[in-house]
Regions:
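N-terminal secretory signal peptides that target proteins for export/translocation
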Residues: 1-4
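Extracellular/periplasmic head regions of type IV pilus-like filament subunits
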Residues: 67-134
Length: 192
């Protein structure tokens, strides 16, 4: 009589394992997808912070070099009773000027606006980021507020899907720059 080799799995046992794995994947997938989305938004916010810091470097470099040809500068603004100088650079200017190195630079558009205090009673410079990478948008959020969790949600001033920037070009007049500052202050509390 021949011995039968019973060391393998039956078809039913293999199907049961496949069904259990499928159920586990279906349960875990929404959590993993949510984590991936939050990571992408977090990376985008970090990019916004790096663009704002690059604008700080560009402004400081232009002052040291005594050049006014870097970005857009408007002097004599008054916001909330304090005097400011407006400085703005587009993201493409930051990249082409060597202030930021990006492999996927063409994916980013937008501006970084800086309101630099010119009076002694003003606290710190205000850097406002408005940018998109064709997947997410930041509209008028200050550098100090960018890292906060409240901006990792949808809504005005926050990070959200889409490609619609409120301000995609630098102000060209003092009146426009001052109006933007007042709007940023009202909507997002950037000048408090």
């Amino acid at each position: 009589m021949r011995k039968v080799n019973n060391k393998g799995f039956t078809l039913i046992e293999l199907l049961a394992v496949i069904v259990i794995l499928a159920i586990l994947i279906m349960v875990a997938m929404p959590a993993v997808t949510s984590l991936m989305e939050r990571a992408k938004v977090g990376a985008f916010v970090t990019e916004g912070e790096s663009f704002a810091k690059a604008a700080q470097t560009a402004y400081t470099s232009s002052l040291i070099a005594g050049k006014n040809n870097v970005g857009k500068t408007i002097t004599g603004l008054t916001v909330s009773g304090s005097s400011y100088t407006y400085f703005c650079m587009t993201i493409s200017e930051l990249i082409s000027g060597g202030f930021i190195e990006k492999a996927n630079a063409s994916d980013y558009t937008g501006i970084v606006e800086a309101y630099i205090p010119t009076s002694t009673n003003t606290s710190t410079p205000k850097y406002i980021v408005s940018m998109t990478n064709k997947e997410y948008v930041i509209n008028g959020v200050s550098l100090t507020n960018l890292g906060g969790n409240k901006y990792l949600t949808t809504g005005a001033g926050g990070v959200y899907g889409g490609n619609t920037l409120t301000n995609s070009a630098c102000s060209t007049t003092a009146n426009d720059a001052q109006t933007r500052a007042a709007n940023y202050n009202t909507n997002n509390g950037n000048f408090n």
